[in-house]
Amino acid sequence: VENPLSSVDVLVIEDDKNVVIPSMQLPKNETENKKIIMHKDKKKIFISYAHADEKFHNRLMTHLSVLKKYIGGFEEWSDKKIHAGQHWKEEIKKALDDANIEILLVSTDFLASDFIENNELPPILRKAEAENTKVLCLLVEPSFFLKSELSAFQAVNKPEETLAEMEKPAQERVFLKLMDEIQRIIEVE
């Protein structure tokens, strides 16, 4: 079976630089059995969470790192990327401004956070309405999600099936569902 990419050039996107590589320079096995996705722009993912939900944040980051290995096309950002000496509020604002996918780990602690309510949710909701930013709510624990303005967005999981109420294999299936949704957004846009 001949390599279907043998007569085309491959666009490789690394660190926001586009490099076109003639396919004849790629070993045939380099592209076989791999899905190649052409990305117009690298998507920027902003992750909003309450620090009380850090274990779910960490699990999300692990899943995103695996997804990035397989499809690329995005950069994820959470407050873990803020380093000593940086103006943390400015870093969060910049990341919010740049993001076109927002992942919200919704819990009672998340909804109770004044910082999230006053600094993160307003730009997220504004961009979702005006700029086609995708808002993906991952329901971490039972909360007032259905009474909040976030309930306008279809959540990844059902309010009666939150991550905290699930055994680990079921949690993993919800994270995989979220990864499928992110991949769909990246491939479609």
Where are the regions that the model predicts?
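Conserved N-terminal substructure of TIR/SEFIR domains
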Residues: 14-105, 124-134, 140-141, 169-189
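Short beta-alpha junction loops
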Residues: 108-109, 138-146
